[in-house]
Amino acid sequence: MRKYIKIGVAGPVGAGKTALIERLTREIASKYSVAVITNDIYTQEDAEFLTKNSLLPPERIMGVETGGCPHTAIREDASMNLEAVDEMVARFPEVELIFIESGGDNLSATFSPDLADVTIFVIDVAQGEKIPRKGGPGITRSDLLVINKTDLAPFVGADLSVMERDARRMRNGQPFIFTNLMKNENLDGVIGWIEKYALLKNIEDPASLVR
């Protein structure tokens, strides 16, 4: 009986996907058995960053070089990633959480249901306050939307209240959360969401979660 949960993490280049996984693994690796699979088109840069900066040992981090369009490797033809999952489970039969990070993509990125049990989509304030209302499957269909880099709002003229209003409208009751991962702000809310909705712990919704 399979006992691990696969969490897909997608979003545009530079939004904070790798930073989110790095900080999550730092906080939860002592509590859960965790592994990470990253996707890059031609390099293993994200895997190398996590190996250098994460608390996870190198053998719990695997890089997949997709060699093409990043969303193909997580949706239309997820075979390379599914093989990586199988290899990781063979290495660590006790694994409980496997984070699968997509390559940087646009707002239409979605994971094959065979590859991810739940999905997190990361955008950032620096892209402008209009990003939530642009929609796209990443915004509207992900299980959790993370709006990162709230500290940059004053510098790019973004109104967080407008972003919250638009995210509420586009998400239609699905949760989202504002973060500043550089300072771990609301990281506990993301962890709480994972524990409640991915690991199915009997806990309250995190206070920082918005619907």
From Swiss-Prot:
Of which family is this protein a member? Belongs to the SIMIBI class G3E GTPase family. UreG subfamily.
Keywords, in A-Z order: Chaperone, Cytoplasm, GTP-binding, Nickel insertion, Nucleotide-binding
The function of this protein is:
Facilitates the functional incorporation of the urease nickel metallocenter. This process requires GTP hydrolysis, probably effectuated by UreG.
Q: How does it assemble?
A: Homodimer. UreD, UreF and UreG form a complex that acts as a GTP-hydrolysis-dependent molecular chaperone, activating the urease apoprotein by helping to assemble the nickel containing metallocenter of UreC. The UreE protein probably delivers the nickel.
Q: Does the keyword Nucleotide-binding apply?
A: yes
Q: Which organism is it from?
A: Actinobacillus pleuropneumoniae serotype 5b (strain L20)
Q: Report the GO terms under cellular component.
A: cytoplasm
Protein name (record): Urease accessory protein UreG
Biological process according to GO: urea catabolic process
**Annotated binding of GTP, by residue:** G11, P12, V13, G14, A15, G16, K17, T18
Entry-linked HAMAP family: UreG
Q: Which GO terms describe its molecular function?
A: GTP binding; GTPase activity; nickel cation binding
Subcellular location per the Swiss-Prot or TrEMBL entry: Cytoplasm
Q: Name one Pfam family in it.
A: cobW
